[in-house]
């Protein structure tokens, strides 16, 4: 049975590139509303993926040339937010990370069959998306868009 969806949720915000000090635990984040073709998932479990760490430390920025073990704890000084996501689009802060998740669909947007509400789902964290002139770029949950380190 699906309970009423609250207006606010708990989430972990990534406030910038760097070490773990850039992560902020918050309980005042608005619950997202699904748009057309989207679903809202109540997160049951979320795992830490290397994408979450690499996004936090800024390793995807084209200016970073060192290995991840060089800046893995504190991040990289040469990060450029303009290209620091998996796909190379500008990084937007704050960002809710969390590339891997499973949960239950609790709401659907326009064009999605309402019978999906209540279904358990495992989220594919990497989607193909058109970015600039590259038609098959990787769009990653928790990097290009908010992810699963939240209740919804």
Residue locations for each model-derived region?
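Basic/polar N-terminal segments that are highly enriched at the extreme N-terminus
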Residues: 1-10, 15
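Short N-terminal binding/cap micro-motifs at the start of the first secondary-structure element
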Residues: 18-23, 50-51
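Glycine-rich beta-strand-centered segment in the early N-terminal region that forms part
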Residues: 30-46, 60-130
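Cytochrome P450 core scaffold surrounding the K-helix E-X-X-R motif
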Residues: 51-57, 132
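Short, P/G- and charge-enriched loop/turn segments at secondary-structure junctions
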Residues: 88-94, 137-143, 149
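Short, Lys/Arg- and Gly-enriched loop/turn segments at beta-strand edges
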Residues: 128-138
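A structural motif shared across PLP-dependent enzymes of the aminotransferase-like
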Residues: 129-131, 144-152
